[in-house]
Amino acid sequence: MKKHFTLPRNAILRDGGEPHSPNPSISKSKPPRKLRSAKENAPPLDRNTSTPDHRSMRMKNPLPPRPPPSNPLKRKLSAETATESGFSDSGVKVIVRMKPLNKGEEGDMIVEKMSKDSLTVSGQTFTFDSIANPESTQEQMFQLVGAPLVENCLSGFNSSVFAYGQTGSGKTYTMWGPANGLLEEHLCGDQRGLTPRVFERLFARIKEEQVKHAERQLNYQCRCSLLEIYNEQITDLLDPSQKNLMIREDVKSGVYVENLTEEYVKNLTDVSQLLIKGLGNRRTGATSVNTESSRSHCVFTCVVESRCKNVADGLSSFKTSRINLVDLAGSERQKSTGAAGERLKEAGNINRSLSQLGNLINILAEISQTGKPRHIPYRDSRLTFLLQESLGGNAKLAMVCAVSPSQSCRSETFSTLRFAQRAKAIQNKAVVNEVMQDDVNFLRGVIHQLRDELQRMKNDGNNPTNPNVAYSTAWNARRSLNLLRSFGLGHPRSLPHEDNDGDIEMEIDEAAVERLCVQVGLQSSLASEGINHDMNRVKSIHSSDGQSIEKRLPEDSDVAMEDACCHTENHEPETVDNMRTETETGIRENQIKTHSQTLDHESSFQPLSVKDALCSSLNKSEDVSSCPDLVPQDVTSANVLIADGVDDPEHLVNSASPSLCIDPVGATPVLKSPTLSVSPTIRNSRKSLKTSELSTASQKDSEGENLVTEAADPSPATSKKMNNCSSALSTQKSKVFPVRTERLASSLHKGIKLLESYCQSTAQRRSTYRFSFKAPDSEPSTSISKADAGVQTIPGADAISEENTKEFLCCKCKCREQFDAQQMGDMPNLQLVPVDNSEVAEKSKNQVPKAVEKVLAGSIRREMALEEFCTKQASEITQLNRLVQQYKHERECNAIIGQTREDKIIRLESLMDGVLSKEDFLDEEFASLLHEHKLLKDMYQNHPEVLKTKIELERTQEEVENFKNFYGDMGEREVLLEEIQDLKLQLQCYIDPSLKSALKTCTLLKLSYQAPPVNAIPESQDESLEKTLEQERLCWTEAETKWISLSEELRTELEASKALINKQKHELEIEKRCGEELKEAMQMAMEGHARMLEQYADLEEKHMQLLARHRRIQDGIDDVKKAAARAGVRGAESRFINALAAEISALKVEKEKERQYLRDENKSLQTQLRDTAEAIQAAGELLVRLKEAEEGLTVAQKRAMDAEYEAAEAYRQIDKLKKKHENEINTLNQLVPQSHIHNECSTKCDQAVEPSVNASSEQQWRDEFEPLYKKETEFSNLAEPSWFSGYDRCNI
């Protein structure tokens, strides 16, 4: 989530230096806001009207303060800026959409669409870009507005869509769709708004572009934000807690909303979630016109960034485009909406904001039509201030004006259409926001140019006859270096800063200082004979275009005044913090060889190249005066370029001697083991400031070795000569560079004074720094007090040093050196042992042979370890040679594979040209693939990376085992610790002050193991002891010399092996890089061949189609020609007939193609028709079955109703019969007693006729009850076979 919202401003439209227009009408068109009318076309106020107080205006104005007239943010438009900008004009696209009428408004329509781009309102015609009638769909609106917007966005243009109109006219529906249209189940519906459709198309097009330009590494990134402007206050809809946000404006980034939330989106679902979240927080309210009226302006912004890079030429581009979707609140009248209270306040703010927008559009339209400059009031409202880039700026604007065709909205419709007409007249300046980067090709050109200059410098450096060439070469080098620095390529990486603020005393090796001064004098004498001539020539040398070098000095002064840099033979120059140096050698090679040979004969140092011996060299335009008192006249060398800008002693030391090591020395000596008497060699070291361990104070150089030396202090005469040399240097340098002369001179004098103070202050002759020509990576040694220590040296070293002292130093220094040599001459190489005057002396006598034995044993062990290491290095070299051979084999295989690819291309070309048949092509291709498979198999089996990994693994295992054996099993660590302890005790004896007087008179012990102890030697044999000790001294010296020579040879062989290994590693890296490049080239070639095959297949198919078409055309032409020949047409008419025949044949072919297309269409339509007929038939059958089922259901329902009715009737009859039966039973019950009484009477009276009477009475009763029995029988018969009971059983 990103809290930043940027709207870039078009700098072309800004004109800060242009004054206000003198036209009074223009100045009056912008009165103070407090007296402004709320109407759009309010007349300008009188010029004499008094302006209100600025304080009250500032209190009521919520916007940021206006910039002063001199501020470049003040924007004015004029015809000159429009013509001078050079950008293509793009007008505003206006689309009018008519809202469908409501039920109460039908039949009362005043807006009528005349054509696709015009409409009439009450007889008045308006013309726009497009007209959407009430029947238009959301998809049609998207095709008119959204589709071009997406394409413009992908092309790199800023695009905006405004929805403008009265309240309830359908703006929100057009922009966002219905209220539930953003849910997932409605995302694919027809009612979707413009915004979801735009982003659906945008993400689809992004995927297409990424697939289409996959080789260009095309990547897109989209981020969105949503805000509303409610009552002139900006609220973040994605984070509603952030209210009243401020609009900021910056010259670089343009207009943006501070602290606005931006979220990255990747698909349509993310955008929909943002819209649902944001639009749910938007202010809406109900009015009498619209139940869901938007009460604020809503701005949805999406920034689309694309990056692509062409791998072939290194060209990369960065495009940025912005989509602004603005849903403006609708204008409304209080009379029609009935707004009151808060709604009335909202309506007032909305109308005021829209009025200011209309005023802004009026001014922009007037500027576009008349070309007169006017002030554009972007700051009148938050809306216009935020969207000023879309209005007359760098954007393509489309405005959707929604109108209602009802008679009741006539005035609002006219106002909207007039607003749209004015907006259509605006001309924006839309440009593609793309940044192209072509650094690779440019740098290739720079490299080519620098190579040419380097070649010219090498060629011209060997030409001593033309001295002017060196000057031009130096200036070309400076110009090239300027070019590199302008692109950041000439700035070397600095070493990490070291904290040197500690209280550490540094010891200066003052002999090295003097030798440095001597060498500076030697080298500066090179140009002593031709200094005046060269200084005069600097002023007269002219470049090829006629300009003198003096005139070009100010241009290149920043390069010329760079600090000096020390170059080595095998390494790049390195720089320390705040020290960037450059070196330009203008010395001929024959002179360099002569000077190096001279230095070899006259100094004790190992022969060094000029790059190692000097800090840097002067250009021939920068001459240095020599010190004739210090330097012989027959010695010549290179000029030295003194680094400027050095203000402190440490920098002075660094600039004076780049190859000197600065060794920190502790306040008290640290007792550590001395180094073996092994002579280190000079190595090509980089110029750097390194702190290392202390070196022995009196260690001296020996036979081509470069060790730390220490000599006597320089004399005042020498310091005076150094002062003269530095003053001469600063004086002559000021002639060429007058800018920094004083600073350079002061720094030199300060450094020389500091050296003099160090030389004269301390009694022990120690200084803060030690100067040494020792390589920075050499082994450290222990620092011991010069007056209290004895050091083993090689015979002859004193003589060499003394010779050097006699050759170059002053008289005082020479005497001092001779005295020191005489003091140490009697015992130059042997170890000093105290006499037997104390218990300490006796202890040291007993420990001397044992200590010497341990030292020799340790040195032998180390020599054996060194031999073993050399053997391992030789085996590694052998393995590396094998690895090189495998790399060469791999490169040869790659070359063969490349050749096979070229042969394949030739075969493909032959196949396309028809020279090679398809079968031959397949056979050759198969053979080539078999050969390539074999090569790849060999490469896989003998891959160098596998062997390299095995070699490294074996080497690591051997090293681990050796370290384990050396320090663990052999006990070398304990032995070394014992040697260190013994040597410390021995050294303590020498440092003891009580033994200093005995050191001068003591005799040396015999260092042979067969010699008798010191206590057993009588005093009478002094002469024989001296002879014996002399012999032992000689033997010891020879043995030590052999060990030193052997160690030197081994070290030389080791360094040679290391150099060979480094060289082979470098070659391996080159071979590996070449292999990778060949692999990449092979991959690219294979991809290119695949694309060529695809294109070839497409071309072959098209070729076959064209051949068939050509044959048909040719046949038609032949037919027409035959017909013309049969008709007897000849001459000019035949040519006309031929042309006509060709045209007719082409038309026939086209008609045949169309006929075939129509035939296919007809077949498809017939198929669809048959399917439709079958579907209709099936639907008819289904309908018939449904109708039959419906009729059966109706009959069954009717029968069920009849059965229910009959059952009800039967139940009623049963009830009646039950009642009747009960009545009859009651009647019979009453008749039975009467019958009994009557029977008794009758028995008494008529006993004779009893049987007949009984028979008649029974028959009478039966007759009376017979109808009842019949009815019961009928009822039972009716109930048993009833269909209703069977129907029930069927239903069950």
UniProtKB/Swiss-Prot annotation:
GO biological process entries: male meiosis cytokinesis; microgametogenesis; microtubule-based movement; phragmoplast microtubule organization
| Domain of life per record | Eukaryota
Coiled coil regions, renumbered to chain: 945-992, 1047-1232
**One GO CC term of this entry?**
chloroplast
The Kinesin motor domain, residue ranges: 91-426
Q: Keywords, A to Z? A: ATP-binding, Coiled coil, Cytoplasm, Cytoskeleton, Microtubule, Motor protein, Nucleotide-binding
Region Microtubules-binding, as annotated, extends over 293-297, 326-332, 375-379
Phenotype of gene-disrupted mutants: No visible phenotype. Kin12a and kin12b double mutant display defective pollen grains leading to the production of fewer seeds.
**Ranges of compositional bias, category Low complexity:** 19-29
Q: Where is this region: Neck?
A: 424-461
Task: Note the InterPro entries from the entry.
Answer: KIF15/KIN-12, Kinesin_motor_CS, Kinesin_motor_dom, Kinesin_motor_dom_sf, P-loop_NTPase
Subunit structure, per the record?
Homodimer and heterodimer with KIN12B. Interacts with TIO.
Described by its record, this protein's role is as follows:
Plus-end directed kinesin-like motor enzyme that plays a critical role in the organization of phragmoplast microtubules during cytokinesis. Constitutes a signaling module in association with serine/threonine-protein kinase TIO that is required to support phragmoplast expansion and cell-plate growth in plant cells. Binds microtubules in an ATP-sensitive manner.
Specify the protein name: Kinesin-like protein KIN-12A
User: What is the source species?
Assistant: Arabidopsis thaliana (Mouse-ear cress)
